[in-house]
């Protein structure tokens, strides 16, 4: 006969509880953009596409693939979190998120990055862009009084919708994004540039 120490039992139960809580990253998040991404109804082809092309930025984990196992957590990139060597998460991660993304590019192939992250997370990547990477940031808004006005909720919906659309149509280049018309948005050439694609609600367009 032998006796198991209570501390070991507690540790094992904790490990099992955490194992039960693990879920693929793209299914673990419940924000508006993920609701419109709707990964729960993906086809096998769509799953394959996002696993090859989609990267999720996390203040806790860093750069995640959609199928990476995670335990649900609450930690936003803007959270003040001082460590021994950093004053916040931007300082903590420094250029590591960009380097992780850069390593995913195939050697000697064109390097194109589609930025559908919020401004909060974009700040952790865009300052470190290298000259050999063409990055396009997508902006979703309405044209109000001569300016593009971005509404946070609508933009989140559109970002998720665009990723789902990209997976459905197997989009391969930034140029192909101009065909996106989800949620009533249309690409607006006159307000866009080579590094920023502006999509406006089609019933609210710039004056001629």
Across the structure, where does each feature detected by a protein language model lie?
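Internal, well-folded beta-alpha domain core
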Residues: 39-193, 198-208
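Active-site helix-to-loop segments that bind/position phosphate- or nucleotide-bearing substrates
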Residues: 11-12, 16-44
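Glycine-centered flexibility sites
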Residues: 7-10, 31, 59-62
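Generic detector of short alpha-helix boundary/capping microenvironments
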Residues: 1-2, 19, 45, 50
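Single conserved hydrophobic/aromatic residue that forms the stacking wall/gate
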Residues: 1-10, 15
């Amino acid at each position: 006969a032998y006796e198991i120490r209570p501390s070991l039992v507690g540790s094992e139960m904790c490990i099992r509880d955490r194992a039960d809580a693990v879920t693929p990253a793209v299914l673990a998040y419940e924000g508006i953009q993920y609701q419109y991404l709707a990964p729960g109804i993906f086809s096998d082809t769509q799953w394959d596409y996002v696993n090859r092309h989609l990267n999720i930025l996390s203040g806790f984990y860093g750069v995640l693939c959609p199928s990476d196992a995670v335990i649900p957590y609450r930690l936003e990139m803007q959270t003040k979190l001082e460590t021994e060597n950093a004053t916040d998460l931007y300082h903590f991660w420094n250029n590591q998120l960009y380097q992780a993304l850069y390593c995913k590019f195939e050697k000697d192939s064109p390097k194109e990055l589609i930025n559908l992250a919020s401004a909060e997370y974009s700040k952790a990547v865009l300052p470190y862009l290298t000259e050999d990477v063409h990055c396009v940031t997508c902006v979703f808004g309405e044209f109000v009084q001569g300016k593009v006005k971005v509404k946070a909720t609508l933009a989140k919906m559109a970002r998720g919708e665009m990723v789902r659309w990209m997976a459905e149509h197997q989009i391969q280049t930034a140029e192909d994004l101009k065909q996106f018309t989800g949620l009533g948005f249309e690409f607006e050439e006159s307000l866009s540039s080579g590094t920023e694609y502006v999509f406006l609600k089609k019933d609210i367009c710039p004056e001629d």
